[in-house]
Amino acid sequence: MFKEFKEFAMKGNMVSLAIGVVIGGAFSKIVTSLVNDIIMPLVGLLMGRVDFSNLFFTLGSGNFKTVQEAKDAGVATVNYGIFINNIIDFLIVAFSIFIIIQQISKLTKKKGENIVPDKKKCKYCYTEINSQATRCPNCTSELKEN
């Protein structure tokens, strides 16, 4: 069982996925910092010194200046400013991933144009076979190279 797990874990896709998750986590921290520390303060300044992380309304009685004051008083709050920050964070991450995938697709398309196809069909039995095969494994016909 350990041997099977080792084979599974060492496959190229599994390692690539693990690397992608680690890099994605680090990238997410960078984007979150960009949104919270650079973009939203600038937007808040342009809108009259609004601090988006402190935009909220209470679901109970009382008048509180900050989210923390309301939480300390035990009053439930709807923190729509933090939600706006998270939406902007998500949009930046989604757009960045879109751009990266688009560029990778362009690169692989250009590289893939000159590659010999992996599969071809046997002209006798129409079975899909390896493009470098000289004999069909299904009908055993000898295949002449094109």
Curated annotation (Swiss-Prot):
GO terms for molecular function: mechanosensitive monoatomic ion channel activity. Keywords: Cell membrane, Ion channel, Ion transport, Membrane, Transmembrane, Transmembrane helix, Transport. The keyword Metal-binding does not apply. It is a multi-pass membrane protein. It is found in: Cell membrane. GO terms for cellular component: plasma membrane. Coiled coil: none annotated. It holds the Pfam family MscL. The keyword Disulfide bond does not apply. InterPro entries: MS_channel, MSC/AndL, MscL_channel. The chain crosses the membrane at residues 15-35, 81-101. Its main location: membrane. PANTHER family: LARGE-CONDUCTANCE MECHANOSENSITIVE CHANNEL (PTHR30266:SF2), MECHANOSENSITIVE CHANNEL MSCL (PTHR30266). Homopentamer. Belongs to the MscL family. Channel that opens in response to stretch forces in the membrane lipid bilayer. May participate in the regulation of osmotic pressure changes within the cell. This is Large-conductance mechanosensitive channel. The gene is mscL.
